[in-house]
Design a protein with these regions (language model features):
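Catalytic Walker B motif of ABC-type/P-loop ATPase nucleotide-binding domains
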Residues: 164-167
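Conserved ABC transporter NBD signature motif
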Residues: 63-71
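Short coil-to-helix segment of the ABC ATPase nucleotide-binding domain corresponding to the Q-loop/switch region
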Residues: 101-109
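Conserved ABC ATPase signature
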Residues: 139-149
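Helix-to-loop junction immediately C-terminal to a conserved catalytic motif
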Residues: 55
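The feature captures the beta-strand-to-loop junction immediately N-terminal to the Walker
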Residues: 40-42
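Conserved signature/switch motifs of ABC ATPase nucleotide-binding domains
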Residues: 85, 138-141, 159, 192
Length: 221
């Protein structure tokens, strides 16, 4: 059966002051369609770098990353950008919302760029699902931290990607908002039959996934 994602002997190295730093070493795993995976490990173990590699935001030093049978490292930048826009949604702990755009405009912009029909109503629909139906016309500065995070997630998944990459999506939130965000992500994955790879330090959140991958010193344990 074809896998949604496959990593084979992936390495990521940096040269700093003539010293070779091994960020990720011989990382191999597969992701099925509709699978949820949590990636755990200590700070600096390489978790975020893994998300960056899969999303095509970093280039592996060696090894192979295949998404739907396309080898990410062999694609041109515009081809990778196209995949990120339509097939892979990325949610970061630190995100950027356009400050002079309303919540609705921040989300609908992704649809407009991709020439999707009826972008406003589609953006309204997902924001309403995220409990922001009454905040559509608010600027980011008028939203709480949890509300801003929900807008950022809505923007990342409004194109209905097959794979969501989430890097500490609840890291800066209180327990109430953390639970809300986690419910949003897992409900979306279930409804849209998508896959999720989520980096988290929260054991309770990690255990919501079907599988847990632990990284230590750049290696999968």
């Amino acid at each position: 059966m074809t896998k949604l994602l496959k990593l084979t002997d992936v390495n990521l190295n940096y040269n700093t002051d003539n010293n070779l730093i091994n960020v990720l070493q011989d990382v191999s795993f597969e992701v099925d369609y509709k699978e949820t995976i949590s990636v755990v490990g200590e700070s600096g173990s390489g978790k975020t770098s893994l998300i960056m590699l899969i999303g095509g935001l970093e280039k592996a030093s060696s090894g192979k990353i295949e998404f739907k049978n396309f080898e990410i490292s062999s694609l041109k930048e515009d081809e990778i950008s196209e995949i990120r826009r339509k097939d892979i949604g990325i949610v970061f702990q630190s995100f950027y919302l356009i400050p002079n755009y309303t919540a609705l405009e921040n989300v609908s912009l992704a649809l407009e760029i991709n020439k999707i029909k009826d972008p406003i109503n589609k953006a309204k629909e997902i924001l309403d699902k995220f409990g922001l139906g009454k905040r559509l016309n608010n600027l980011p500065s008028q939203l709480s931290g949890g509300e801003q995070q929900r807008v950022a997630i809505a923007r990342s998944i409004v194109m209905k990607p097959e794979l969501i990459l989430a890097d500490e999506p609840t890291g800066n939130l209180d327990s109430e908002n953390s639970e809300l965000i986690s419910n949003i992500l897992f409900d979306y994955v279930k409804e849209e039959k998508a896959s999720l790879i989520m980096v988290t330090h929260d054991n309770k959140l990690a255990n919501l996934s079907k599988r847990i991958i632990k990284i230590k010193d750049g290696k999968i344990e």
